[in-house]
Amino acid sequence: LFESKFIKVFDLQYREDRHYYNATRRDENDLVAAKSTEEFKKMLPDAVSCVVIWNPSGDDEKSGHEPCLLMNREFRYPTGQYLLSVPAGLIDPEDCTGDNDNTAPLIKTAMRELHEETGLKVTEKDTVSVINPCLFSTPGMTDESNALVKIVLNRDSLNGMSQEGAVGGELFDGFDLLTKAQAKKILEDGVDEHGIYYSVYTWAALTYFVADLWR
């Protein structure tokens, strides 16, 4: 029904005169609705969202070296607002080469997006792992999916942070380093400190951090 570089709309006719419209990032031969159960279980998501935690040494509140959740302010065009967001991006074809392990493309994408959106590179001291391999955003209207990947930055400074790596239509407006108490307040309030709503992936990152599931 419609096709652009990043979005397509398909008419899923599930029985005679019964139609369901699906907004997707996928080509017709890769639609999730047409996959078998086994194909569904093995598929890669469209994108990766990153839960990025800065974990300086001397980890305790009294020392002032408390771990923080690193988030950014990204303009999301359908909302018309800068939203409190996690570093995230689509899986590129080159992320899927050279390894049969389904987690490898997720890790590669997460590391690339961290560098593009924050200027930071993962080092041997840091840890990267998959939290969830595939989550659906809004399955009532789209088959778009994201993996959640944890990146723990085990370092005493975040020197070199920058948003100059933005590509395409990406627009950023700074970073937020949230303590556990600040993240908990945003969860309880349902909005950020500016009174702006946020995405379900931001909610997931806040919850994961506050619950100490990253440790």
PLM regions: where:
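N-terminal leader/linker segments that precede catalytic domains of diphosphate-processing enzymes
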Residues: 1-83, 90-116, 120-163, 176-181, ...
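Short glycine-enriched loop/turn motifs at secondary-structure junctions
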Residues: 166-172
